[in-house]
């Protein structure tokens, strides 16, 4: 399959498997260089993560959520992480976790990953703005899966778009039933 027609998720998996094969990440061998790649990846990924969570907030949570982000920080195991999270009234009342998109590079990890609150471990291979933008569908899938799993931990009432009056117009012009 030519590179130009290869879907982003396949490219990401190929990079991941090649890194495992070669003992590298983005061409880097040392932890220090890999962390430098990770720091840049977080900077490029931040606007994409914010876009995904803003879409969910506006379309599903009816603008009721608060978006927070941590920025890059060192973890207890010596790794690095950054996260973007949505919290909203129904989620807090139900006592379930936030929807979280997290980029993390565990202290003993060979390379970094993406994860959600309930969805874990997708290879993070971002080395350009284009790579970051290509993660949009993956971040959407992680955030959507998190919300789906959180509904099962609580119930559908944590999603304001579902509890709004029947026939509510959604952002895309469709109506709920």
Which residues make up each language-model segment?
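N-terminal, Lys/Arg- and Ser/Thr-rich interaction peptides
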Residues: 1-33
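Intrinsically disordered, low-complexity regulatory segments enriched in Ser/Thr/Pro
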Residues: 3, 7, 12-15, 81-138
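Generic detector of well-ordered alpha-helical segments enriched in charged/polar residues
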Residues: 11-14, 18, 39-42, 136-140, ...
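Feature targets compositionally biased, intrinsically disordered low-complexity regions
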Residues: 70, 77-78, 94, 105-106, ...
């Amino acid at each position: 399959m030519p590179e130009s027609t290869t879907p982003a998720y396949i490219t990401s998996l190929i990079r991941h498997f090649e890194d495992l094969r070669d003992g590298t990440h983005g061409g880097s061998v040392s932890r220090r260089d890999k962390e430098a790649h990770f720091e840049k990846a977080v900077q490029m990924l931040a606007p994409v993560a914010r876009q995904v969570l803003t879409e969910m907030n506006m379309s599903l949570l009816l603008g009721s959520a608060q978006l927070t982000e941590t920025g890059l920080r060192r973890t207890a195991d010596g790794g690095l992480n950054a996260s973007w999270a949505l919290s909203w009234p129904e989620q807090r009342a139900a006592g379930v976790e936030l929807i979280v998109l997290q980029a993390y590079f565990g202290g003993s990890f060979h390379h970094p990953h993406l994860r959600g609150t309930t969805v874990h471990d997708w290879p993070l291979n971002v080395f350009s703005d284009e790579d970051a933008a290509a993660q949009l569908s993956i971040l959407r899938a992680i955030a959507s899966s998190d919300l789906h799993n959180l509904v099962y931990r609580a119930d559908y009432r944590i999603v304001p778009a579902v509890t709004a009056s029947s026939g509510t117009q959604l952002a895309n012009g469709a109506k709920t039933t």
